Amino acid sequence: MTSVFNRRAALGLLSAGSAAFLAACAPLRSVKKSSGDSSSSSSSSPNSHSPEPSEESVSPTVSPSSSSPASSEPAKSYKGEAKLEKYDTSAGTYEPGTSEHPPRNVPKPIKPANMNENSVAGLYSTIAFYAASFQYFVTTGDRQYLDQVKVDEEEEEGMSEYDEMAQYIAGGVAWFENPKIVITLTTDQPTKSGSGYTWPSTVVFDYGKNVHNAQGQTVPVPSTGAEKPQKGYMKGKYTGGVWEVTIMTYDLSDDS
């Protein structure tokens, strides 16, 4: 097997959705970005929401002096999809997007109380919150929750490729129907690697079949390959009292 883990391939997963969205929107470029401030920050868009209730996001006690998760922690199995346990669903029942309207009442991720703990549980919660926040972002164009997750500098720069797409989505100009971001951990526990940890995983960035716009037009989303599980691993490094996470995948062009 000649496949190797590729940082650029991982960034390709992040940018694939934006590229597909903008390609699908090419015929729609005459549509103006809403009557409001759609060109402003997505956090001030109609899809933006106030932060989650404070009682749900009280910071846990952390031990930044510790360089690794406590050895006394039970060897719990975290194998499987990294799922966030709590969402704010007070807006009502979630409705996927259709040709007539964007997704409605999108559940808002609630930051786990143990997310900043220097433990395997803390790393798991960070990964789960990252997946949920990224899905919320590509659904609503609002990255307020995604900004609560620390990622490496290269990945943060790669996120800038989503800016134009986010403006379209947040302004109600165009939208995906029901995007899904899924990170599945394929081992029970992470493995120590240098100053951090690696966790074998698969990643799915499924942006769905269609992009719709406010003028009633529908354009198919080109396949990116990212809608199928991509093998790789999550990197986690505890720094500054939080977990910094990074996605690593095999090159999309490689056979695995």
Residue ranges of model-derived segments:
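Core segments of small alpha/beta cavity-forming domains
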Residues: 96-174
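N-terminal export leaders
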Residues: 7-11
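Exposed beta-sheet edge and beta->alpha loop/turn motif
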Residues: 17, 32-49, 53-58, 62, ...
